[in-house]
Amino acid sequence: MSGISLNLKRKPKVKKKEEERKRKNVFNEDEVDPQKRSKILITEVNAHEAAKAKRRVIVPACSGRASIVPPKFASEQGPSYGLTESTGEQTGRPDKSAAKSGAGVVPLDQLPDPTGLEEYSEVPVEEFGAALLRGMGWDGDEEEIEGDRRGQKTVLPHEQAGRAEYLGIGASSDVDRSRKDARLQIEEFMPVVKVDRAKDTAADSST
């Protein structure tokens, strides 16, 4: 049988001599400073900013023509920070102080009379559309128009007949689309024939 033996006595610690690490002499120099261990205390860290590359701009050569771009007025220029000094140049814009001083104000006796309720009662809101059409040249004969439309049936958009081919805008067709032989009534379309002008000039010169 095999047994296990336990020794509870503490073994004395063997102190190993720490050998000093020497820096290897790569270049075979006689004197080499030993590497010193030093502590570096970091108090603050500054953000590293990379230098921005300057953008190359192509400046066109000055031409003899005048610029069509209107110059900027003083009010349209960008805001300037700091003390703004007056250069004494004329901006070409009317001064706002002129309106404050009363220039261009119409006297009260020359103002038009205000519109009262009597004027609104003469033309009610319901008749405003008819009044507008009368101002555009309409004679106001609604009875004749209604009489012409009494016998007609209201045609829905999907029931409307198609327009004839090659018919201009606003032109009326002479072909009755309701008839079955409507296509026979339409005359054949004659396309434009290209004429060679060189042959025509040669024929004219020979004659």
From Swiss-Prot:
The keyword Hydrolase does not apply. InterPro entries: Spp2-like (IPR045166), Spp2/MOS2_G-patch (IPR026822). It holds the Pfam family G-patch_2. The keyword Nucleus applies. Residues 1-37, 68-121 are annotated as: Disordered. Associated with the spliceosome. Belongs to the SPP2 family. This is Pre-mRNA-splicing factor SPP2. It comes from Eremothecium gossypii (strain ATCC 10895 / CBS 109.51 / FGSC 9923 / NRRL Y-1056) (Yeast). The lineage of its organism: Eukaryota, Fungi, Dikarya, Ascomycota, Saccharomycotina.
